[in-house]
A protein has these predicted regions:
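Surface-exposed strand-loop-strand hairpins of Gram-negative outer-membrane beta-barrel proteins
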Residues: 1-11
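Outer-membrane beta-barrel porins/channels
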Residues: 15, 21-342
Length: 342
């Protein structure tokens, strides 16, 4: 087992923005273009923890299946303790595993805002506007060269394809949303109070993906072929003719793989694998529309100028992450949104 640290290296050297305002009388017409979300790239050279979870739990399930098959096989042949898949050369019994993994992601949310502010009095003004958001993201990652014990996993999925057990993710996402914005500003004496509220931005990201995921469905057939081949050799070495050895091997294999315990264990392995795989990359299936809302945002600020050359500002920011819909309603796992003070 190779110890892994899942460390992401982010790169966002510059986040530019462009602002424009035209003031006339009591009116101010304003526009801006900026990156309102994302704004960079991140690379995980050892992949993600969710990828390792798939491999680790698959390894444990594979070892459990190997133990069950060997126990049933030994009892069927009258040789308790017989080992075929639990040897150190195969899956082993410890649940050890190894693999290579990588993940790279990029997110850019481009925002174009337009709005107008009106000065109702020398003390009070208000703003209303809207921001159009275009989201563009890309994710690429893989899990390859998976081994359980000393057995490459592809050998029990499709021994003719070395990449049969590989997981590969390559997905582009894009979507559009709109954000209504309101704000107020009030001044009195040396004090200045302001507030801004940005409503939740509903975005549905459309996936365009070319992904690869292994299938456990072929596991019974491939196990059957391996068992028949190995048992045929065992029976031939005991003096049977090749024809008889193959026939007995086929019958024995059929009896083992249709055993209730083996069938149940194999079904559990498939269900576990499919579930964990969907949790890890189901969000990136081709053609799928994924919820990726930008949370509502409240900003409150207070400024005080004891003298003309000094100003003290304090601010409060609230991001309502709890109610911004995301894939599989992950936001419901949050206790609350994000609070910031400055």
């Amino acid at each position: 087992i190779t110890p892994r640290t899942f460390k992401g290296e982010a790169f966002a050297p510059v986040i530019p923005s462009f602002q424009y305002a035209y003031n006339k009388g009591r009116w101010s017409l304003q526009a801006s273009f900026a990156l309102t979300g994302g704004g960079g790239k991140c690379t995980f050279d050892n992949g993600l923890g969710s990828f390792e979870k798939i491999v680790a739990e698959t390894a444990m399930a594979a070892c459990g299946l190997a133990k069950t098959v060997d126990n049933v096989l030994g009892n069927t042949l009258g040789q308790p303790g017989m080992q075929m898949f639990t040897t150190d050369q195969a899956f082993g019994q410890k649940g050890e595993y190894s693999y290579n993994s990588y993940m790279h992601g990029r997110q850019y949310y481009y925002g174009l805002s337009v709005g107008a502010a009106y000065k109702f009095s020398d003390n009070f003004s208000a703003f209303a506007g809207v921001r159009g958001v275009y989201a563009s993201t890309n994710y690429y990652g893989y899990v390859e060269n998976i081994k359980v014990g000393n057995m490459p996993l592809y050998k029990v999925l499709d021994p003719n394809k070395e990449n049969a057990a590989n997981i590969e993710l390559s997905c582009d996402q894009s979507g559009i949303g709109f954000t209504p914005i309101i704000g107020v500003d009030f001044k009195t004496g040396k004090w200045n109070f302001s507030a801004k509220y940005e409503f939740k931005t509903r975005i549905r990201l459309k996936n365009k993906a070319v992904n690869q995921a292994p299938s456990i469905s072929a596991l019974p057939d491939n196990l059957s072929r391996q068992m028949v081949g190995t048992l045929t050799q065992v029976f031939t070495n005991k003096g049977m003719t090749p024809e008889n050895a193959q026939a007995v091997a086929a019958n024995t294999t059929q009896a083992v793989l249709t055993n209730g315990d083996v069938v149940k264990t194999m079904a559990g392995l498939k269900t576990e694998f499919d579930t964990k795989l969907k949790e890890a990359i189901g969000e990136y299936e081709d053609g799928k529309k994924i919820a990726g809302d930008i949370p509502a945002y409240l900003a409150l600020g207070v400024g005080y100028s004891p003298v003309n050359t000094v100003r003290v500002n304090v601010g409060f920011h609230w991001f309502d992450d709890k109610h911004a819909t995301s894939y599989n309603n992950r936001q419901e796992k949050l206790k609350r949104g994000t609070l910031e003070y400055n």
